[in-house]
UniProtKB/Swiss-Prot annotation:
Residues 1-383 are annotated as: 3-dehydroquinate synthase. Homodimer. This is Pentafunctional AROM polypeptide. The keyword Transmembrane does not apply. One of its GO terms (molecular function) is 3-phosphoshikimate 1-carboxyvinyltransferase activity. Zn(2+) binds at residues 193, 270, 286. Residues 396-840 are annotated as: EPSP synthase. Residues 1274-1545 are annotated as: Shikimate dehydrogenase. Binds 2 Zn(2+) ions per subunit.
């Protein structure tokens, strides 16, 4: 068929050509019939990669010499994607055409998908006031939609396709061969337009599409190695579906070229679909959104009484059959869009700017049936009806407008429908089933029968009739799980069917599964009965419930089968229907008490007779049935009567509102027990009931006069008890209630319906109580019904929803009913009946939608999970210290309090019982400690489904569930030495392998904690972890530097061997870039370990970068899944920055960006070629994309081939100021750009093995160059005080300057006169960078500064003066930082509320020591001085909560106190007072654990107090440490550089 060209006429020209492998035809046709001096081929880079452009170029080059000598061809390639369909790209194309001298005879070929077709068509429409062009669509969507009809456009930031023109192409060449290289998802995406077009215009083609869906998906999913597909077996179908779709659009366009009305019909599904797309783009594709929109617009048609429920069901199933989503809630849509919400108000706003609208009036294309629209144009619709269709909650308003009479035909009986499908599939021959219920339940049954190859299924009468051609009971196993949702009937019937399934060559079993509720519902008695009769059935999860694994080939032995049927009659019907296919006749005996719902068993027996098998009841044994062997013979036609359970709702409506309702096709001859509802329930309550053999009419009494029923046994119609309950709720008699019995089976339906009804009636102010096998309802006057404040919860149960909707319209104000879509199980159109037949006003409602913007954690509790020995207990306390006011609750400790020692409990009981109790404790703790608590859990909490559900619910409720982990080998070593905890049953590595994915799914943050070998490493880790906690809780969101800053680019393949270098390498940088692509491994564990090593060594913010090959890195360009996995891991690890390459697919970019939480996103783009100059449109397009993604920082890197490239970059920078911008050029000529870049310049370091990019400089080099260029001024710094001759400060700060290439100076200014310092050094000195203040001026200088930091105010002394401009100065105190960091680095542990500190001395530094110890968490501080009176002044200076105790005698020391930290601030070179030594010795003897003493004096190297402390087991820290640490803080305050390297003075 490759040589056959089909031509379609549009606007009276045969200009649409459809065929296969048409390149030669296309070029020959153009050259023969369209003369031009210049043929311009325009496409995108994706089409170039596939070789399509070159094919056309070669063909032109072959034919031009003979066909058009003297003509030329030009090619232009644009970047792919919707982001490039804009004014800038259009202008660049036009500039190119002008530069090449193109004139009005230019002929353009637009080769590509919809983006290319739309944009290049618009170029053709406007270039030289319009030139000729052809559309050569390469995607299915473009072939059947955008290429046809002459619509051309570009996008703007305010919306898609807002600027464009109608400009008809000379040709549209549709070469179906292009589809061989179309990715699967794009193929399926295009099918949305195909199905939509058939739905509005061509029912015959729609029916054909329905039959081809399975073949279609099978072929397009069978991919070659290069991801292409062989369409040979499907070629005719593909060409036909393309042709038929094109013919419809061509006909419509011919009749209405400029969209006067008829052409609106092509927008079926687009009014709502475009609104959804505007929110979910780019993760959701156009066709996917149109599919969802079409289903919703069809539901709108049904809601308005225009379209039949069967037609909606067909449309729904057809879209779904082609792999398209049919709901925003679709799991794949949710996954792809990261759960992005589509708020109804936003959708309506988006719909308000639809081009079809008339001003503010919205218009939607409505269907009247498959293949025909309601009007020859879009129809007006109101927001109320749209709001209803778009939401899953409904506000039911009053019933005051109810008609006096109504006729309602409920959908087919669910019970009969499911039985008829099973019997027809078991039978032989064709059976036309009419009035089948089209619902979720029957859909699951149809799918299951088809999956097991039990029958061929087709549709007649526009889908109203289901044609089942049974295979005589020959079912075949399938390797795919059969998912049954919450369809209890289907699950029970199919369990017996699965027992008679035959194996195929690949599969020897059938797996039946369902949703979470289905996996709780009972099926045990049926399984027991089948097992005893030879079936091999295995429970895969919970004993007694789905999922089941049923071995094929065993069949049923037959003979006597005993079955307990007190819970469900469906067990009985299931066995009965399959019994004829047993190896011998079956005698089925029901045991264990009176069976439930025997009328349904009678129904089954009657239906079996209709299909040729007669069951006889035993005359000697009760509840026993004899089933002969045989085969069902299908009747030619079987009509399903309407569902009697569903009929109870409109009949009850009449009863409760005093109106008349007739059900025309259910009467006394019905097979269904619920048909007796009107006679047995409503009539005794005061209704007039007329029932014939085939119809039922109810006339309700005057509203409010219903009578209660003292006792009614509803065992024959248990499902109808909910309807009876709501009628009883307004049967008002203070002396009488209504008791309904015989309904105990309703406790194990979709929910516990008895409990549900009691709970929900209470919301209306109606009291009800539970009976042993029923419910008692105490009715009230309907005028006194309350409006449920939080609405009616339906438990996802169709019968709860429909029954309570009857009560809702009688309440005093509108009632909210949640999860209204659950009625789709049996009556999808129930709300339509309320609205159109009963004239009830309904309004859609939506709960407040949480935004995706990251929210601060505030007081929400944090749950910590992870393996044993991961550091949960230790780090939980760090969390509590970080988040002031939080406490720690360890669930292992709670367990011990309740049940005793864990090891003993497991030994005496079992691991299973331990896990059960653990889950109960967790549930209780999550409820009782929901605020201000860190909840540390046991390592195995993720082992059980119950606990996992709890953890996932915590995440849904906005809590942080933090997974802590450390290197597993270190864990093995630690646990092998720990004898206090129960031994693992399995090896630790095996436990980790089993749990690691469970931890992943149950946590929203992850922290990897490598082994700390030194106290400094542990200090750094705790500091970093504290910052991590502050960040993920929103307490300290990383701020983007607003001045000169840099990040160092690591180029190691593994950080472990070089970890000791990391502190030095990151010195002075504002961030450190982990180049993930350069690492030797890319698994999550290795990457997490690398992050952990970084956090062990430095607290510098981390930039996580995956640089792909095309962007100058090593990561494979097309490994999108791995890229997304690792980027998501980075966000879960809470890194400060993530680099997102703007060349990645837009859907991936948007997905990652939407999950950012508190991580900052850097949108980057690199050009290594040097050919993309700074005036190239590519930079502009990438910048617009970055803005659209709302990245936090934009990073563009070009390549300089001349110095002028740097000045072009600066010009680009000056014009693009919307976001912080990193802009540099690579290469030797681009070095100057690195000097002039301000924010986060990438730098290298001399200790790195290589630089990350050509021309990269060190931080020192950049500062030196910047200073030489005059970019920074030289500042003068001083230390002031007396004596300072031996001060180490000048040496310290000069070390800093040298490290960072700064030209500043640091000198001594010795004086004890504060006024002299101010007048001679500070006042009017523009060169002053700052002053370090030492004794005796720390207090005296306070009056010479304009402001004080909080610490300086609290301490009452300063040691740092910082100029802030305009002759103003801030006073700060960094001594306390020096003290705090020195103690921390030495491993000093301070436990809030229990730690005790000591300060020796009474000078200015002692104040800083008091402040430091208090900030660290000391609850009591002792002070000791040779002159105790001086200490009173200090004590009085600080607030009382500092809890300062002056030690002037031994009596002042509490015997119970243990000291954790001490600071000596007395001069180190002066003798100590005997009294002081005596008291100090006593205090030093009262140490706790690893107590640390810091000596503030750094001369001499070892002071007497250090010696005293050391001799008593204290760890002592020399004063030089404090000097360095406070100096580092001073240097940071003055220059903005954080010095992190080790310094010895």
């Amino acid at each position: 068929m490759s040589g056959l060209i089909e031509k379609v006429s549009i606007l009276r020209n045969d200009s649409i050509h459809v065929g296969y492998n048409m390149s030669s035809h296309i070029v020959d046709e153009i050259l023969t019939k369209k003369a031009s001096s210049t043929y311009v081929l325009i496409t995108d880079s994706n089409i170039v990669k596939m070789g399509h452009l070159q094919t056309f170029v070669d063909e032109f080059n072959r034919l031009i010499p003979s066909k058009r000598p003297g003509s030329r061809i030009l090619t232009y390639v644009v970047p792919p994607g919707e982001a490039n369909k804009n004014r800038a790209t259009k202008a660049a194309i036009e500039d190119y055409l002008l530069e090449k001298g193109c004139t009005r005879d230019t002929f353009i070929l637009a080769i590509g998908g919809g983006v290319i077709g739309d944009m290049i068509g618009y170029v053709a429409a406007t270039f030289m006031r319009g030139v000729r062009f052809v559309q050569i669509p390469t995607s299915l969507l473009a072939m059947v939609d955008s290429s046809i009809g002459g619509k051309t456009a570009i996008d703007t930031p305010l919306g898609k396709n807002f600027i464009g023109a109608f400009w008809q192409p000379d040709y549209v060449f549709v070469d179906v061969a292009f589809l061989e290289t179309l990715p699967e998802r794009e193929f399926i995406n295009g099918m949305a337009e195909v199905v939509k077009t058939a739905a509005i215009w061509n029912e015959q083609e729609f029916s054909r599409l329905e039959t081809y869906s399975k073949r279609f998906l099978k072929v397009i999913r069978d991919r070659r190695v290069d991801d292409s597909v062989d369409l040979t077996s499907l070629k005719e179908h593909i060409i036909k579906l393309v042709l038929e779709s094109i013919k419809v659009k061509a006909e419509v366009v011919t009749l209405d070229e400029r969209e006067g009305g008829l052409r609106n019909l092509l927008n079926f599904g687009h009014s709502i679909g475009h609104a959804i797309e505007a929110i979910l783009t780019p993760q959701a594709l156009h066709g996917e959104c149109v599919s969802i929109g079409a289903v919703l617009e069809a539901e709108l048609s049904r809601y308005l009484g225009i379209l039949s429920p069967v037609a909606v069901s067909r449309l729904y199933k057809c879209f779904a059959a082609y792999g398209l989503p049919v709901s925003i809630a679709d799991k794949l849509v949710q996954k792809r869009t990261n759960g992005k919400k589509c708020p109804v108000d936003v959708l309506l706003q988006k719909m308000a700017i639809d081009k079809k609208n008339d001003g503010s009036k919205k218009k939607v294309v409505l269907l009247s049936k498959i293949g025909k629209c309601y009007e020859p144009k879009a129809s007006y619709v109101n927001d109320e009806d749209l709001r209803f269709v778009l939401t899953d909650e409904v506000l039911v308003k009053d019933f005051n407008s109810a008609p006096s009479t109504a006729v309602v035909v409920p959908p087919g009986s669910k019970s009969i429908s499911n039985r008829a499908l099973i019997l027809a599939a078991l039978g032989k021959g064709e059976c036309k089933i009419k009035n089948l219920l089209h619902s979720d339940d029957t859909e699951h049954m149809l799918n299951a029968v088809a999956a097991l190859k039990g029958a061929d299924i087709s549709f007649d009468d526009n889908g109203e009739t289901v044609v089942v051609t049974g295979n005589g009971g020959n079912f075949t196993a399938t390797d795919a799980e059969i998912y049954l949702g919450n369809a209890g009937t289907a699950s029970r019937f199919l369990t017996s069917v699965a027992s008679i399934v035959k194996p195929d060559s690949n599969t020897t079993h059938v797996i039946l599964t369902g949703n979470a509720r289905m996996q709780e519902r009972p099926i045990g008695p049926l399984v027991d009965a089948l097992r005893t009769n030879g079936s091999d059935i295995e429970y895969l999860n919970r004993e007694g419930s789905l999922p089941l694994k049923i071995k094929s080939g065993n069949g049923l032995k037959g003979g006597r089968i005993e079955l307990a049927a007190t819970i469900s009659s469906q067990y009985v019907s299931s066995v009965l229907m399959c019994a004829p296919y047993a190896s011998e006749p079956v005698t089925l005996s029901l045991v264990g008490g009176k069976p439930i719902s025997l009328l349904y068993v009678d129904m089954t027996i009657a239906m079996m007779k209709s299909f040729g098998i007669e069951v006889t009841k035993s005359t000697t044994e009760p509840y026993t049935y004899h089933v002969p062997q045989g085969h069902y013979v299908n009747p030619a036609e079987y009509v399903i009567e309407s569902d009697a359970s569903s009929a109870t709702y409109p009949l009850a409506f009449a009863a409760m509102n005093g109106t008349q309702v007739t059900i025309p096709n259910i009467g006394s001859s019905s097979l269904q027990g619920d048909a007796r509802f009107a006679v047995d329930v409503l009539k005794p309550m005061g209704c007039k009931v007329e029932q014939t053999a085939t119809s039922t009419t109810v006339q309700g009494p005057t509203k409010g006069t219903l009578k209660p029923l003292p006792l009614v046994d509803m065992e024959p119609m248990t499902d109808a008890f909910l309807t009876a309950s709501v009628v009883a709720a307004i049967a008002n008699d203070t002396n009488q209630s209504t008791s309904i019995v015989g309904i105990s089976n309703q406790r194990v339906k979709e929910c516990n319906r008895i409990e549900a009804m009691i709970t929900q009636l209470a919301k209306f102010g109606v009291r009800a109580k539970e009976l042993e096998d029923g419910i008692e309802v105490f009715g009230i006057d309907y005028h006194h019904l309350k409006t449920p404040s939080d609405g009616v919860y339906t438990y996802d149960d169709h019968r709860v929803a429909m029954s309570l909707s009857l009560l809702a319209g009688l309440a005093e104000s509108p009632v909210l009913i949640q999860e209204r879509h659950c009625t789709g199980k049996t009556w999808p159109g129930w709300w339509d009946i309320l609205h159109t037949t009963f004239n009830v006003e309904l309004d859609g409602h939506e709960a407040v939608v949480e935004t995706t913007t990251a929210k601060a954690n505030e007081d929400k509790s944090i749950i910590v999970i992870g393996m044993r020995a991961a550091g949960k207990s230790t780090l939980s306390h760090v969390i509590a210290q970080t988040l002031k006011g939080f406490k720690v609750v360890d669930l292992d400790d709670v367990f011990v309090e309740k049940y005793g020692d864990i090891r003993e409990f497991i030994k005496e009981n079992s691991w299973e019982l331990f896990r059960e109790k653990e889950a109960m404790i967790a549930k209780e703790a999550f409820k009782n400690y929901s605020k201000n608590t860190v909840i540390s859990t046991g390592g195995g909490i993720v082992e059980t489904e119950a606990s996992r559900k709890l953890l996932k619910q915590q995440m849904k409720d906005g809590h942080i569930v933090l997974h802590l982990h450390r290197d597993i080998e270190e864990t093995v070593v630690f646990l092998s030495q720990d004898k206090t905890r129960p031994a693992y049953v399995d090896e630790i590595n095996q436990v980790w392998e089993r749990r690691k994915n469970l931890y992943k799914e149950c946590s929203n943050y992850f922290f990897f904690s490598p082994h700390c070998q030194t106290e400094r490493e542990f200090f750094t880790l705790k500091k970093t972890f504290s910052k991590f906690i502050n960040r993920i809780t929103g307490g300290a969101v990383p701020s983007i530097p607003n001045g000169r800053s840099a990040f160092v680019c690591l180029t190691y393949e593994d950080l472990a061997p070089v970890s000791s270098k990391l502190t030095r390498v990151t010195n002075g940088c504002d961030a450190v870039e982990l180049r993930v692509d350069l690492l030797k491994q890319h698994d999550s564990h290795f990457i997490s370990n690398q992050i952990g090593i970084l956090r062990n060594q430095t607290s510098v913010p981390i930039l996580f970068t995956i640089r792909t090959k095309s962007q100058g890195g090593r990561f494979p360009d097309d490994s999108y899944e791995d890229i997304e996995r690792l980027l998501n891991l980075a966000i879960k690890l809470g890194v400060e920055y993530v680099d997102l390459e703007l060349s990645l697919p837009e859907s991936l970019l948007d997905s990652v960006a939407s999950k950012r939480q508190f991580t900052k996103i850097i949108g980057s783009h690199h050009d290594f070629s040097g050919t993309v100059k700074w005036n190239n449109v590519e930079w502009e397009n990438k910048y617009l994309l970055a803005l659209k993604l709302n990245v936090d920082i934009i990073k563009f890197v070009g390549t300089a081939t001349s110095l002028n490239d740097n000045w072009e970059l600066e010009h680009f920078r000056s014009l693009h100021t919307d976001k912080p911008f990193i802009g540099i050029n690579m290469g030797p000529l681009g070095k100057v750009s690195r000097v002039f870049n301000t924010i986060l310049t990438p730098v290298t370091h001399k200790d790195l093995p290589s630089s990350a990019a050509p021309g990269q400089l060190t931080l020192k080099e950049i500062n030196e160059y910047f200073g030489q260029f005059g970019g920074s001024s030289r500042k003068k710094f001083y230390i002031v005080g007396k004596p300072i001759s031996h001060s180490k400060s000048p040496e310290l700060h000069k070390t800093f300057y040298d490290e960072f290439g700064l030209s500043h100076t640091f000198d001594k200014f010795e004086t004890d006169d504060a006024a002299k310092v101010f007048n001679d050094l500070v006042k009017g000195n523009d060169e002053l960078g700052g002053c370090a203040v030492t004794i005796p001026l720390k207090i005296d200088m306070l009056k010479y500064v304009n402001e004080l930091t909080d610490s300086a105010k609290s301490i009452g002394a300063l040691n740092t003066i910082i100029p802030i401009g305009d002759g103003r100065f801030i006073g700060d105190n960094t001594d306390w930082i020096g003290i705090r960091d020195s103690l921390h680095q030495a491993g000093c542990e301070i436990a809030p509320e229990s730690s005790v500190g000591l300060v020796v001395g009474g000078g200015g530094t002692s104040r800083a020591a008091v402040y430091a110890l208090h900030q660290m968490g000391c609850s009591k501080i002792y002070m000791l001085n040779r002159t105790p009176s001086k200490l009173s002044e200090i004590k009085n200076h600080f607030p009382s909560n500092y809890n300062i105790h002056i030690v002037d005698s031994l009596d002042a020391i509490d015997e119970d106190d243990k000291l954790d930290a001490a600071v000596s601030t007395v001069p180190g070179d002066k003798p100590l007072d005997d009294q002081l030594i005596s008291l100090l010795k006593k205090l030093l003897e009262k140490k706790r654990g690893h107590a640390v003493l810091l000596e503030a004096a750094y001369k001499p190297r070892e002071t007497p107090i250090m010696a005293l402390a050391f001799s008593r087991g204290w760890k002592v820290v020399p004063g030089s440490k404090m000097l360095v640490n406070q100096g580092i803080e001073q240097f940071y305050k003055w220059t903005g550089y954080q010095f992190s390297s080790h310094i010895d003075l």
